[in-house]
């Protein structure tokens, strides 16, 4: 049944376009896009994610610098390091790999990244732009990836009933803002929602981002559902599964993203797209 949304293929299309765009941009300037990745500690999953980001960045001509810091670093010391990157004109974008150790104040760290280099879209100013409907700043990459995957198969979203399971600042909240802009009717559910199945089963589109392995079975959907699984649940060193019971759900819905190979590659593609945007913005700033 060919109803799988191939996030890897979609991401490769985006990356191919970005590579050409970078070649064009760098042919007219001595500068190149450069991404700084701040990794605190040695979380195995974070190391894998960072490695994938670096690999894809290099493929399309984005330079990277990895700042690997001890898990015992203090919040203020980490802010000082971020400020150095903010002031470095060669750095186009900055990401702080999450999660951070519990001893670090995450909100202070995310607010320390310059909004003009905040390619994750987590700075309060960028969050405010998105939820105010202002076309400025950066939007979280996973939310952008979800929207692009949906629109590939459902270009006109006006009037669609969308249920997002998850209310995080990374997926649920920013994606809801993007979908409202597309004239969808959006319902956000979460772990405390009652009668979840009765809500999701009526939806045109369901986005699962709750971090609960295989929680959503076929009964949660209808035959016309588009299912976007954002869950990444690591059950061993080399195996991840989603929030949706893919094997039993695939044949019961219209379209579905797999895990892996779904939203993960799309997230990286849009992270790099945001990096190129930051690079272009910096070139414009230098010219004015």
Curated annotation (Swiss-Prot):
Transmembrane segments: none annotated. The keyword Membrane does not apply. Coiled coil: none annotated. GO terms for cellular component: cytosol. GO terms for biological process: L-histidine biosynthetic process; methionine biosynthetic process; purine nucleotide biosynthetic process; tetrahydrofolate interconversion. Keywords: Amino-acid biosynthesis, Histidine biosynthesis, Hydrolase, Methionine biosynthesis, Multifunctional enzyme, NADP, One-carbon metabolism, Oxidoreductase, Purine biosynthesis. Its EC number is 1.5.1.5, 3.5.4.9. Pathway: One-carbon metabolism; tetrahydrofolate interconversion. NADP(+) binds at residues 166-168, 191, 232. The keyword Oxidoreductase applies. It catalyses: (6R)-5,10-methylene-5,6,7,8-tetrahydrofolate + NADP(+) = (6R)-5,10-methenyltetrahydrofolate + NADPH; (6R)-5,10-methenyltetrahydrofolate + H2O = (6R)-10-formyltetrahydrofolate + H(+). InterPro entries: Aminoacid_DH-like_N_sf (IPR046346), NAD(P)-bd_dom_sf (IPR036291), THF_DH/CycHdrlase (IPR000672), THF_DH/CycHdrlase_cat_dom (IPR020630), THF_DH/CycHdrlase_CS (IPR020867), THF_DH/CycHdrlase_NAD-bd_dom (IPR020631). Signal peptide: none annotated. It holds the Pfam family THF_DHG_CYH_C. CDD domains: NAD_bind_m-THF_DH_Cyclohyd. GO terms for molecular function: methenyltetrahydrofolate cyclohydrolase activity; methylenetetrahydrofolate dehydrogenase (NADP+) activity. Homodimer. Belongs to the tetrahydrofolate dehydrogenase/cyclohydrolase family. HAMAP family: THF_DHG_CYH. Catalyzes the oxidation of 5,10-methylenetetrahydrofolate to 5,10-methenyltetrahydrofolate and then the hydrolysis of 5,10-methenyltetrahydrofolate to 10-formyltetrahydrofolate. This is Bifunctional protein FolD.
């Amino acid at each position: 049944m060919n109803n799988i949304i191939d996030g890897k293929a979609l991401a490769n299309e985006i990356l191919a376009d970005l590579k050409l765009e970078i070649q064009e941009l760098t042919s007219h300037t001595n500068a190149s896009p450069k991404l700084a990745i701040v990794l605190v500690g040695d979380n195995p999953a974070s190391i894998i994610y960072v490695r994938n980001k670096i690999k894809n960045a290099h493929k399309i001509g984005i330079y990277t610098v990895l700042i690997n810091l001890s898990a015992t670093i203090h919040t203020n010391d980490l802010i000082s390091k971020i400020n150095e990157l903010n002031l470095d004109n060669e750095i186009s974008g900055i990401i702080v790999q999450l999660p951070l150790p519990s001893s670090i104040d995450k909100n202070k760290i995310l607010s320390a990244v310059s909004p003009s280099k905040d390619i994750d879209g987590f700075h309060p100013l960028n969050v405010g732009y998105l939820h105010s409907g202002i076309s400025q700043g950066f939007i979280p990459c996973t939310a952008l990836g979800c929207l692009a995957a949906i629109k590939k198969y459902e270009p006109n979203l006006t009037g669609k009933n969308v249920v997002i399971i998850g209310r995080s600042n990374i997926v649920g909240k920013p994606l809801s803002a993007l979908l409202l802009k597309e004239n969808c009717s959006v319902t956000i559910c979460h772990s405390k929602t009652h009668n979840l199945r009765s809500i999701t089963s009526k939806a045109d589109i369901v986005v699962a981002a709750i971090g609960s392995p295989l929680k959503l079975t076929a009964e949660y959907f209808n035959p016309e559902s588009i299912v976007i699984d954002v869950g990444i649940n690591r059950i061993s060193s080399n195996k991840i599964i989603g929030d949706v019971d893919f094997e039993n759900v695939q044949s019961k819905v219209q379209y579905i993203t797999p895990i892996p190979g779904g939203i993960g590659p799309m997230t990286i593609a849009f992270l790099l797209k945001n990096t190129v945007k930051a690079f272009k913005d910096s070139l414009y700033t230098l010219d004015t």
